[in-house]
Amino acid sequence: MGMKKDLLLVLTIESVVLGVVLGFVIRPFNPSNDTISLIGFPGEIFMQIVEMMILPLIMSSVISALAQVRARDARRIGIVTIIYYMITTFLATFTGIILVSSIHPGDPELIHELGEGTLENTALSTLDTFLDQIRNMFPENIIQATFQQVQTEYMPIKPSRVRNATSMNMTSEVLHKQTLTYTNEMNVLGLIVFCSGFGIILSILGDQARLMINFFIVLDAIIMRWISALMWCYPIGILSLVCKNIIDIDNLTETAQALAMYVVTVICGLMIHSLLTLPLLYFLVTKKSPFAFMTGMLQALATAFGTASSGATLPVTFRALEENLKIDRRVTRFVLPLGATITMDGTALYEAVAVIFIAQLHNIKLSLMDLVTISITTTVASIGSGSVPAGLDTIVIVLTTVGLPAKDLSLLLTVDWLLDRIRTSVNVLGDSFGAGIIHHLTRSSLLEADTDELIRQIREDIDILNNPHQDTLPISHHSVQSTIQNTQNAMQAPHVYSKSARASFAPIPNEEERKALLKESIALNKSDTHIV
């Protein structure tokens, strides 16, 4: 198994490198559109397969995880998760602002070299984006939320005739009306909220909902087994995606030279956040080596770079955290889907740098209040950027908020293919460190819950064993030995653990064996508690 993991890691990293090399080798030959389509076709099919798995993966993982924790533990995990994500997103934005203000990559002379931008302004505001996220948290139709989400749009209405007081001429004024529309994107945030509530209620119901809990546990195991097989397709898909993106870029050399300092600024900011800020935060909380943690995440980071999608990387991130780093699956299955939806550290940093860079291009001096506004709006806007490959729409909102021209943002599209992949890797790393920190902070309460559950199950077993008319254990119960064994398995391999995965029938031990098993279980509980 270890050799297979290492081989898959090597193949994933090699696919990224080979995709870049092939892209630059093929570019000078100016391949036709049909050739480019054929090169990118495996990557296109790969992304469709991965996106097909996102919906069942999120629903089964969130519900099965929260159904196996106490309500108060779920509440604590949720609160700590939100606090962590808000802190890291703000730190990323702050890093970007400090760096771009210090390096000052935006030279007004570049406007003559790059030409005028073509992107249109948007009437959307930061408030619109924030309210859209609140609306999407509570979808009116859960089925519709699987393929659509709400988005505010401003539609032009019939122009009104306005009299000009100075010239007395009639002029036309274009007005816009705010409307709510639906875009064809999965409402991941709404699904997570629904599944979280569903899972918590299942946990409260306990044995009354055991059949439903078992269903989602098994469904989660099926999806992960399926994805484990599909992971061998990741290297081919990543190679195809990276190669096609490099071939598709127009005027790569000229624009890259003009925007070199901008690219360096963004990459430096992302490196500082991922190699200094996040590891330091992880070390301060857990007192463990962050670099050993990052080593276990190499395949997930390479996949994030290749796909430029936090959502597509989600299965690999689950596997890396649960199997390589032994993070409790009840933490990963809630923290990671939420992080892939609302937490975009790399995107927030990138947006802050891009906005101030455009201001520098136009030689616009930003006040302290402008910088504060940028930090707040980029934090809020990055939350709405979703788990799919990021676009530049959210930056337009930030530019409009501080009164900067949004049209010049199109000049950055040429280098966005590279920066998008790097910032996606940073997003995934931030989510992963968050899972590690939250696992550390909640481990004692989760172990306490496991101990209470184990004691309750043992008492039920003893009551059944004391029944003289019972020859074998019924399907709904299990032996003390199987309880102990499953608890030990849970500590060693939380990824494959299921509290319901017990033997259907087990022989009844005699009185001495029963007492010995009970003592063993109590000793196990004490040792597990002392681990914390």
Swiss-Prot record:
One annotated GO biological process: L-glutamate transmembrane transport
Pfam families reported for this sequence: SDF (PF00375)
Alphabetized PANTHER family for the sequence: SODIUM-DEPENDENT EXCITATORY AMINO ACID TRANSPORTER GLT-3-RELATED, SODIUM/DICARBOXYLATE SYMPORTER-RELATED
Membrane-crossing segments per the record: 6-26, 46-66, 83-103, 182-202, 222-242, 264-284, 352-372, 383-402
Main location: membrane
Topological domains annotated Extracellular: 104-181
Naturally occurring in which organism (per UniProt): Caenorhabditis elegans
Protein name per UniProt: Putative sodium-dependent excitatory amino acid transporter glt-3
Cellular component terms per the entry's GO annotation: plasma membrane
SUPFAM superfamilies in the cross-refs: Proton glutamate symport protein (SSF118215)
Membrane topology according to the record: Multi-pass membrane protein
Gene Ontology MF annotations: glutamate:sodium symporter activity; L-glutamate transmembrane transporter activity; neutral L-amino acid transmembrane transporter activity
Residues bearing glycans: N164, N169
Keywords noted in UniProt: Glycoprotein, Membrane, Symport, Transmembrane, Transmembrane helix, Transport
Location relative to the cell: Membrane
Topology feature Cytoplasmic, residues: 1-5
The keyword Protein transport belongs to this UniProt entry's keyword annotation: no
